[in-house]
């Protein structure tokens, strides 16, 4: 069946099919989450791509695909209430354009290999996966849009990430698209059998992993996640701080009485400098913990005063009724939200005010003890970074917790 029935329009096919495939891939991501569509999303676009010979058309097609896919995937960035609507929208569109440009090396490789369709199709999943890897590195890393994320609902195939990382899942999705495309073109049973094998392999591996993994009775940590639902317009009001702290204590009291191992509060849950001027709040919380072995993990604002300069951090701390177990300072900050890029080189950039914070990047991979294990606590965006999570594991983390403040997006 001709793809043209889906895209009868005056827009060139190399643009319209790029949009069509981008939309299909976009709705396979959360929050819509039709993850199964990722297995076929690239096929309409590939049918047109293999016919293109003009460099400009290939570049435009790749950019168009990237623009609409990323727009659908991260459109919600424009609804950040931490800044004005204009800044939030410009920030979102700029991010979409930046991410779309980052896939253009794939267009260059596609053009170079145009004499061999087989080479193009073979290289496509490799190049795309490599680009995903590089997109996860550096201060401008943004792996949030990895196509592997489309498979969150499929517990079995994503088990291969234990051995391949998230990139193996992305590669598998791309390979399935290529295999189905080739099978449709060849119409040979052998090709379809190979495609079935490619598709089934991670499912089989995942089932084996899940079914053979044996958990001991003590291989668990009892956890309570507390969501105070405090609006950002009220959170930092001085007159309401004690009320907010009391809300968190009240919501956590049942878990304390049940001796839950770990009680998790959100990112910057406490609107006070808990380890500085806010120690009276820490005493209040510990008073409630006096008869409980529970530990509380919470996000806090924090600062150090070094060389007559205040250095602010987005941080996490864990404590119980008697002991403080160290502080983690967020390592991977969000550009233009938590700091201004290059402000370390040009300090005057920190004076720009787009509604962003001016945090300092942490350096230590802090681990927290819990029963016989250790764990790392990452903050919000950091949870998307494979390299950072891997480093926590290399440092000795047995598991990872994530604290996040989605109050920036009221309908999150």
What are these regions (language model features)?
Residues 29-44, 69-76, 227-229, 259-273, ...:
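Short, conserved active-site loops that position catalytic residues or coordinate cofactors/metal ions
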Residues 153-155, 199-265, 272-287:
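Membrane-interface segments at or immediately adjacent to transmembrane helices
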Residues 240, 246, 257, 262-412:
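Solvent-exposed soluble domains appended to multi-pass membrane proteins
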Residues 112, 250-254, 391:
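A generic secondary-structure signal
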Residues 147, 226, 328:
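Hydrophobic residues at beta-strand termini and immediately following loops
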Residues 2-210, 411:
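Membrane-embedded alpha-helical bundles of multi-pass enzymes
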Residues 138-141, 217, 307-311:
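Short glycine/proline-enriched turns and hinge-like loops at secondary-structure junctions
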């Amino acid at each position: 069946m001709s793809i043209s029935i889906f895209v009868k329009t005056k827009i060139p096919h190399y643009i319209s099919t790029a949009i069509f495939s981008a939309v299909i891939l976009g709705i396979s991501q959360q929050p819509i989450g039709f993850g199964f569509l990722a297995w076929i999303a690239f096929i309409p676009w590939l049918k047109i791509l293999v016919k293109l010979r003009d460099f400009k058309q290939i570049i435009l097609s790749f950019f168009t695909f990237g623009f609409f896919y990323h727009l659908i995937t991260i459109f919600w960035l424009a609804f950040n209430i931490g800044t004005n609507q204009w800044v939030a929208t410009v920030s979102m569109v700029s991010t979409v354009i930046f991410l779309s440009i980052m896939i253009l090396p794939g267009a260059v490789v596609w053009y170079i290999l145009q004499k061999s369709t087989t080479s193009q199709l073979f290289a496509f999943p490799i190049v795309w996966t490599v680009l995903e890897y590089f997109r996860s590195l550096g201060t401008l890393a943004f792996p949030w849009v990895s196509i592997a994320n489309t498979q969150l609902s499929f517990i079995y195939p994503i088990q291969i990430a234990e051995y391949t990382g998230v990139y193996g899942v992305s590669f598998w999705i791309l390979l399935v698209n290529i295999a189905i495309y080739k099978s449709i073109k060849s119409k040979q049973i052998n090709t379809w059998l190979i495609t079935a094998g490619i598709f089934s392999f991670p499912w089989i591996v995942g089932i084996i992993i899940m079914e053979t993994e044996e958990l001991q009775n003590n291989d668990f940590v009892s956890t309570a996640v507390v969501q105070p639902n405090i609006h950002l317009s009220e959170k930092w009001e001085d007159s309401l701080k004690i009320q907010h702290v009391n809300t968190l204590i009240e919501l956590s009291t049942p878990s304390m009485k049940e001796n839950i191992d770990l009680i998790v509060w959100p990112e910057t849950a406490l609107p006070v400098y808990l380890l500085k001027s806010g120690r009276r709040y820490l005493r209040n919380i510990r008073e409630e913990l006096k008869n409980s072995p529970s530990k509380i993990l919470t996000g806090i604002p924090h600062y150090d005063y070094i060389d007559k300069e205040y250095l602010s951090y987005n941080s996490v701390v864990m404590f119980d009724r008697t002991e403080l177990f160290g502080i983690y300072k967020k390592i991977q900050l969000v550009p233009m939200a938590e700091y201004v890029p290059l402000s370390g080189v040009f300090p005057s950039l920190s004076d720009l005010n787009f509604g962003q914070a001016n945090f300092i990047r942490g350096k230590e991979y802090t681990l927290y003890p819990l029963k016989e294990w250790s764990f790392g606590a990452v903050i919000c965006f950091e949870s998307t970074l494979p390299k950072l999570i891997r480093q926590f594991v290399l440092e000795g983390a047995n598991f990872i917790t994530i604290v996040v403040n989605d109050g920036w997006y009221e309908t999150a």
